[in-house]
Structures are given as C-alpha cells and as structure tokens.
C-alpha cells in the first residue's frame, strides 16, 4: 500500500518493486499509463529508494537506477498464474547482480524470470532471456 511504501522508504532500501497499482496507492491517484509514473517514481527516489523496478504486466517493466531508465519489453505468454511473478522478478534481478551481470542484463533476467513464472514454464527462463529486449529510455 502507499503507507507501506512510505514506511519502508524511511529505511533507505536498495531496491523496491512496485507494480502500477501499488505506485498509484503511493501517489494517491490512479496511474494508468507509464507516462504518468515518473513523478511518483521521483518521489520514491527522493524518499530514499535507490533502485526501483516498476512492473507493468504484459507491458513489461522499467528499472530506474542512478538516473538511468531501462525498459524491458513484455512477452506474450500464456497466463497460468500471476502469483509469485513479482517475487520471481526481484529474485531474478538480485541473482543476476550477484552473478556479476550488469544492471541491464540482471534486469533482462528479472523480466524473463517473471514471464516464466506467469507462464508456469520456469524451465524456459533462459529462452525468455533471449527474447526480452531491454532498451534505455
């Protein structure tokens, strides 16, 4: 919720991963389009978050880190479940960084892990890594 994000920001987290609904709750107004997100993202950064991954479902995700914005394309996959997709995205990103990948490549891995989880096809994660495009915004 918005209040949860405010409380967490006081601790200066290295990474947070809201989705659009959670970002809307933090902002206090609906954010239906990615073009409406930057002001709220900036408020999260000013509030203490270092890196932010904004998940947007089939529209992909954005990584805000040190003034750089990366966009990972969404993949059209069959939806088996959305439960755990955010956790898969976070764990993919953290695992990638721990493996020594660049932020861009760790973000690609994160998006692939989330897509594989949604599809219920975790064994296809490496294939999804090759299919996901990441570009700087």
Regions found by a protein language model. Give the residues of each.
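Conserved phosphate-binding/catalytic region of the ribokinase-like
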Residues: 6-7, 34-137
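Conserved beta-alpha-beta core of the PfkB/ribokinase-like small-molecule kinase fold
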Residues: 1-35
């Amino acid at each position: 919720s918005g209040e949860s994000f405010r409380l967490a920001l006081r601790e200066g987290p290295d990474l947070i991963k809201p989705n659009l609904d959670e970002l809307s709750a933090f902002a206090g107004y609906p954010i239906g389009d990615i073009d409406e997100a930057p002001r709220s993202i900036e408020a999260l950064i000013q509030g203490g978050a270092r890196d932010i991954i904004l998940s947007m479902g089939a529209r992909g995700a954005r990584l805000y880190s040190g003034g750089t914005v990366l966009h990972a394309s969404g993949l059209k996959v069959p939806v088996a479940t959305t439960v755990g997709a955010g956790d898969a995205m976070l764990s993919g990103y953290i695992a990638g960084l721990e493996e020594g990948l660049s932020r861009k490549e760790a973000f690609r891995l994160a998006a692939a892990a989330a897509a594989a989880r949604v599809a219920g096809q975790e064994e296809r994660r490496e294939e999804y890594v090759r299919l996901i495009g990441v570009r700087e915004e």
